[in-house]
């Protein structure tokens, strides 16, 4: 019997690819979706999902326009901030795929965990800003979290393989990889003034503009180290990130096999395609792994030998991101991520230069507002106040002169 699934962030990069996979799935039936406003990007999916009952469109005007084109959904389209909560309450047994971007994604993450629902999680901010709340929920409720991120899927596969085949092992450390982004070969003296069209030319992945900029600064890789630390309960200093130019080796686990007294490593090697990670999450970790042949082993070894440390001069924001989390925890990351998002929006709108993304983030780390302890009671306050802070900061001129 097909399992019910709800896709949140259905018109974004991950959500759209998930729907492409679900069109031909015998394992799932799509019963609900949610997105902000871009209904025209979603309409092409309607013929494929005859069990789709409810649609959440956050923007009221866009919701009304959608209904005017699709009157059959007139009573089944919700808008406003409570729409997702209503949708999840209608299907308490459904699997939830959360591909919402930004700080807002933490709310449906917590709702799904509260409902004991399995959560396929592409919203990395949930761990970055809300890991303390997630851990509390996971102590009480029975839902499972399956990551949708090539690095964390890779780590999951490696850890599973090591625990299955090396019973007497001692974990040493983890590695996740980065491509280095679009500016990795640009002379260092030219990076600060990099143009939008150059920053958006990702060398290996096809992603949203926001994530592509985060790849150029490696803010996203800082987030992924934090996410891995919180997800697998491993200290940040035991997780390294390195440059793998082809993005074919996504992650690795280093361990000691005490049975043979050897230090070994297990790497995950797969194409640069987010559908690999999405498929693994949809299978809830049961998707069979590719069995390597001799050519694969040689290729992996070649890539591993070509790993390069992350240069602090070229990628200072990778280190600043980790510093912010170490200093301010989840609470400070609300503000850091909100400023990063607003700064990228300003850069893409040609309102600030590339190097000013770094200046804005340095400013928030050095001028963090007074932080109260994060709780469910003040969660929405954190989201709104960090949004206001970021908007006001980007409208100021003073920080740009620092």
What is each residue range found by the language model?
Residues 1-402:
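Catalytic, metal-anchored helix/loop core of enzyme active sites in primary metabolism
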């Amino acid at each position: 019997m097909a399992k019910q699934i709800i896709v949140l962030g259905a018109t974004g990069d991950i959500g759209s690819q998930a729907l492409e996979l679900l069109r031909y799935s015998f394992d799932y039936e799509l019963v609900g979706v949610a997105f902000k406003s871009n209904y025209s990007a979603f309409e092409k999916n309607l013929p494929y999902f005859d069990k789709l009952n409810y649609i959440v469109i956050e923007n009221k005007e866009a919701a009304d326009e959608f209904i005017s084109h699709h009157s059959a959904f007139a009573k089944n389209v919700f808008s406003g901030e409570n729409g997702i909560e209503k949708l999840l309450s209608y299907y308490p047994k459904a699997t939830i795929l959360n591909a919402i971007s930004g700080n807002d994604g933490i709310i449906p993450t917590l709702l799904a965990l509260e409902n004991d629902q399995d959560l396929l999680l592409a919203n990395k901010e949930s761990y970055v800003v809300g890991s303390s709340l997630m851990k509390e929920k996971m102590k009480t409720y029975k839902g499972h979290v399956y990551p949708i991120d090539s690095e964390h899927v890779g780590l999951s596969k490696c850890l599973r393989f090591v625990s299955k085949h090396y019973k007497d092992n001692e974990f040493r450390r983890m590695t996740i990889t980065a491509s280095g982004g679009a500016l990795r070969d640009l002379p260092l003296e030219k990076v600060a003034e990099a143009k939008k069209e150059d920053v958006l030319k990702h060398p290996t992945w096809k992603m949203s503009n926001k994530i592509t900029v985060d790849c150029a600064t490696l803010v996203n890789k800082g987030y992924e180290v934090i996410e891995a630390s919180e997800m697998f309960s491993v200290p940040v200093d035991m997780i390294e990130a390195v440059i793998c130019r082809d993005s074919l080796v996504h992650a690795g686990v280093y361990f000691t096999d005490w049975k043979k007294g050897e230090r070994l490593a297990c790497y995950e090697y797969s194409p640069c395609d987010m559908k690999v990670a999405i498929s693994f999450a949809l299978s809830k970790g049961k998707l069979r792994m590719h069995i390597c042949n001799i050519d694969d082993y040689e290729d992996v070894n070649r890539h591993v030998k070509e790993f390069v440390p992350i240069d602090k001069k070229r990628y200072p924001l990778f280190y600043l991101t980790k510093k912010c989390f170490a200093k301010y925890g989840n609470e400070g990351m609300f503000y850091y991520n909100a400023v990063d998002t607003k700064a990228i929006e300003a850069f893409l709108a040609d309102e600030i230069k590339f190097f000013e993304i770094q200046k804005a983030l340095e400013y928030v780390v050095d001028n963090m507002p007074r932080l109260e302890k994060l709780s469910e009671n003040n969660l929405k306050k954190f989201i709104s106040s960090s949004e206001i802070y970021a908007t006001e900061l980007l409208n100021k001129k003073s920080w740009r002169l620092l």
